[in-house]
Amino acid sequence: NSLILHNKRQIHKDVYSRNAKGEKLMLRPVYSDKEEATVVCRYIKQLQLKEHFNYSDFAILYRTNSQSRIFEEEMLRQTIPYRIFGGMSFYQRKEIKDVLAYFRVVVNPEDEEAIRRIINYPTRGIGASTIEKIIACAHLNHESFWSIINSPVKFGLKVNNGTLNKLRSFTELMSSFIAKVETMDAYQLGVKIIQESEINKDIFSSTDPEAISRQENIEEFVNGLQDFVESRCEEGREEYSKLTDFLQEVSLLTDVESDDDKEGEKVSLMTIHAAKGLEFPTVFIVGMEENIFPSPMSSSSARELEEERRLLYVAITRAEQYCFLTCAKNRWRYGKLEFGTPSRFLNEIDPAFMEIFSDDFVSERLSRPVSPKPAFTAASIRPAHLRPVKIPTVASKNHADQSTSQTISTADGLKIG
């Protein structure tokens, strides 16, 4: 109630529960988005033991679809079954499968399924009839699809000169990527592929809501590449940070996911929009930071900001027993490490109804300082003319212990920690 009172366009009402007085909202500041996923999974396991909850008693709510990626990966690592409510898992989304198909061809040009997926994406004028001719020519010559498009004249592919030029441009592009497999890490080569194939231009050319969701997914995918490389470097395994290694890790994660696709006791992951009308004993509302929640698109409109506030109200009221909110001090966004500001909405919740927790689930307060981390830089994959703000690269910072101290100020001045 204290939150929604900040909306001017509302019919005043006081919401109450017929259940016994519940727990306060629990705010858990974390160092990074990676730690956010780890902490949420840890709390799920703790509450299972403490309250004898089933996995289906938990929901993780986020503002945008792209935020699911890091939670999916952590749950797969910790063997916590989950389902994406009202959508599909991160690596099954079309735009992600398209990029992965490029990666697969770069690592293995003989992957015919992948090459047929990308040969005309983004559109380059190589249509279905040409693809059928390539397949027929490959069968006739007992050669691979890749061999035919690399040497179409040699193998007698019957297409016109315009199509031959298009095939040559495609194979030259892919060969330029293949040449970098051993010299670039997964992030460097991945960004190069997304940019030079012009996937980024295709994805960022529209501003409709579905297109924005695809853009956020691609940006989160790049964050995942960056996170993968950084993790390998921190482990002293830089030599295993190549594109081949990244694909192996994704394959392992998606194999685990496909082995557990039956309905049953699973944690629900969903956007807040998808959560309307549902309730769960325990809810985690993640990404409580400015430019995530509220969305950056709401900053110029009082009406849209009120809608964001209503969404948080909806999210909080999905919880029957426990409601956790998390905010990260650092988060990979748009291929760069950004320093987060806790959401202004946290300042609007009556402090009497919110507790701040550290790594100890019960009550231990934040107490130890964050120590610096080696610098690590990244670049944006948005086409230059489409970037909303030009932000210089930011160096990341390490933390020696996951139970850390941080004093964070929200947009409206709330101090956390």
Predicted regions and their residues:
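Helicase P-loop NTPase motor core
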Residues: 1-81, 104-108, 164, 178-181, ...
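Short, flexible loop/turn segments with low-complexity composition
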Residues: 13-16, 237-238, 359-367
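Short strand-loop junctions, especially beta-strand C-caps/beta-turns
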Residues: 30, 58, 87, 328-330
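Structured loop/turn residues at secondary-structure junctions
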Residues: 32, 63, 87-88, 272-275
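Conserved GTPase G-domain signal focused on the G5
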Residues: 36-37, 128-129, 358
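Conserved helicase C-terminal RecA-like lobe
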Residues: 54, 68-80, 93, 100-355
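Conserved helicase motor
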Residues: 64-65, 84-94
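Acidic, low-complexity intrinsically disordered tails
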Residues: 349-417
